[in-house]
């Protein structure tokens, strides 16, 4: 989702934006309602979405993409590249806090990468316990 949100932000700043995804669909890690909203925002912002493509190389003023569906390479003229890849857990802050405070919980992507709906639910459940 982060890459999609960055694409929307940059497009709304007046940039022409390509959103390149290796998977067959944009926003597969989000819930249905979030995905519908996301796709509407990207459409309104005129973000050009390319699915089933892999980044092969970044040149000074272009990028080369390889289609994952057919034996075809595409070259796009660009000015800037923003790369948003995957999710990695980071619980460093939790480790510092757990010994200094009672009722410290590790949640969301800090615990392990997951879909946003699961992370939000987990946050709600932990907050409910703390009330």
List each language-model region with its residue ranges.
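Intrinsically disordered, low-complexity Ser/Thr/Pro-rich tracts
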Residues: 2-3, 46
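A conserved FAD-binding loop/helix module that cradles the flavin
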Residues: 3-9, 25-35, 92, 98-101, ...
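A Rossmann-like FAD-binding core segment of flavoenzymes
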Residues: 11-96
């Amino acid at each position: 989702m982060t890459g999609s949100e960055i694409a929307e932000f940059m497009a709304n700043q007046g940039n022409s934006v390509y959103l390149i995804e290796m998977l067959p669909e944009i926003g597969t890690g989000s819930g249905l309602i979030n995905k519908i909203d996301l796709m509407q925002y990207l459409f309104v912002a005129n973000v050009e979405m390319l699915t089933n493509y892999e980044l092969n190389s970044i040149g000074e003023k272009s990028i080369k993409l390889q289609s994952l569906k057919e034996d075809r390479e595409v070259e796009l003229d660009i000015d800037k590249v923003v790369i948003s890849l995957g999710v990695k857990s980071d619980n460093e802050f939790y480790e510092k806090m757990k010994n200094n405070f009672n009722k410290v919980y590790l949640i969301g992507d800090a615990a392990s990468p997951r879909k946003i709906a699961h992370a939000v639910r987990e946050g709600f459940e932990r907050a409910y316990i703390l009330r």
